[in-house]
Amino acid sequence: EKAYKELGTVTAIMAGCVILAVLPNAQNMYAQWDLGQNSIRGATELTTTTPSGEKISSGLDKDYAFAWSYGKGELLTLLVPNAYGGSSGGMLGPDSELYKELRAKGAQVGKEVQAPTYWGEKTFTSGPVYFGALVCFLFVLGMFVIRNPLKWWLFGGSVFLILLALGRNFDSFNDFMFHYLPMYNKFRTVEMALVIPGMVFPIIAIWGLKEVLSETVSDALLKKGLIAALA
């Protein structure tokens, strides 16, 4: 009975927090919802057929929604920002080979030259999603030294959202999610799902660092975490 009482109390507190968080933004949220009903993300009187043969009557079609799917290899940019070249309009300085070649050919260039440095599979991009090398290092360390089981909920949620960001690059999973996960077919780009892991990683990183600095972590566990983080 005590456990049920505690569960009820925690649930009530969480529900109250959700309500308090929503109320200040209720007007903006309603305006966004109302606008969405009359946009390409809303319902339509017509049923359209996508190039892949899928029939839709509400939300974005799958081909359009998955156009900016994050590549599996591109997940490396979470750790190394320019692993896939950067952006479609990157700036190259005098030290780059392209800049030197343009100057050698007599091209009029300034201190920098703009060029499509991105070489991933998206049509174009303004830049990669980057969490930070230090944050990623501390995140892995934190997963080892944090003893609170809450870390697994944060980790699992992050993995789930990263999989959503892959879009068509993990189609066996995301095809189901596109049709049955509420609001997923209304995302501007599926890679926007990386926003939440981008906040969770620093939380785990700081939490883990706190555990280390509090000197409550055994040397063996700390060593194991450091080896995994460096790997």
Give a label for each model feature:
Residues 36-40, 44, 147, 181, ...:
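Membrane-interfacial segments
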Residues 18-28, 69-88, 152-166, 228-231:
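Hydrophobic alpha-helical membrane-insertion segments
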Residues 136-143, 201-213:
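Transmembrane alpha-helical segments
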Residues 116-129, 160-200, 213:
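Membrane-helix boundary/interfacial segments in multi-pass membrane proteins
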Residues 5-13, 17-22, 61-66, 126-129, ...:
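Hydrophobic alpha-helical scaffolding
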Residues 5-33, 48-56, 159-160, 224-231:
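Hydrophobic alpha-helical membrane-interfacial segments at the cytosolic entry of transmembrane helices
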Residues 2-10, 100-113, 138-168, 217-227:
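Membrane-interface helix-loop-helix junctions at transmembrane boundaries of multi-pass membrane enzymes
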Residues 27-142:
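Periplasmic/ER-lumenal interhelical loops and adjacent helix-loop junctions
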